[in-house]
From Swiss-Prot:
Residues 98-118 have a biased composition (Polar residues). The keyword Transferase does not apply. This is Coat protein. Keywords: Capsid protein, Virion. Residues 98-126 are annotated as: Disordered. One of its GO terms (cellular component) is viral capsid. Its main location: virion. It is found in: Virion. One of its GO terms (molecular function) is structural molecule activity.
Length: 174
């Protein structure tokens, strides 16, 4: 039973989209500086969010171990915790604020839970309010350290063991 649970958790972590905490926080703060009542600023926000690049790694490339001013870099799993719903809300809100597109960059259809009345369907300021709220919640979660992982924590969760053989570099996944 314990192995099955570990295997499910490791599979989810391996398939997840990981972002550097600092990249995500910098992007959120750049967006919050803009005037989101202006459509051009919402388009700029959408472009900033779409330009976020996930951490690239694989079986032969170790998860990056970056140092920041305060210590080791922390990473965010965009598929779990508070970040999954918040990122979806941010993507959907930017889509709803700029146009009624059918799908955004993450493949999320912009469905925003609002009261079913004509004002909510026609008023982009409501989705901009949701965008501001989601940005504030995301910034708060990142600053408070909610669901953040270091490289070591991620590798432990995946069960990866790295060995440096006596004759040179390399790795062994366990």
């Amino acid at each position: 039973m314990a192995y099955r649970q570990w295997n499910e958790e490791a599979s989810k972590a391996a398939c997840a989209t990981w972002y550097k905490r600092t990249d995500l926080l910098d992007t959120i703060r750049k967006i919050k500086k803009g005037d989101l009542s202006i459509t051009a600023q919402v388009v700029a926000a959408k472009n900033l969010i779409s330009s976020l690049t996930p951490v690239e790694w694989g079986h032969a490339t170790r998860f990056p171990d970056t140092m920041v001013r305060t210590g080791p870099e922390h990473y965010v799993n965009a598929n779990e915790g508070p970040y999954s719903d918040l990122l979806d809300t941010i993507y959907a809100s930017t889509d709803k604020s700029t146009c009624d597109s059918s799908t955004n960059a993450r493949g999320v259809t912009p469905t925003i839970s609002m009261p079913n009345n004509s004002r909510s369907r026609d008023d982009p300021s409501l989705s901009r309010h949701q965008l501001r709220t989601a940005l504030s919640q995301m910034e708060k979660a990142l600053v408070n350290g909610e669901s953040l992982y270091t490289r070591t924590t991620i590798e432990n969760k995946l069960g990866i063991v790295w060995h440096a053989p006596a004759g040179g570099g390399g790795n062994q996944n366990g």
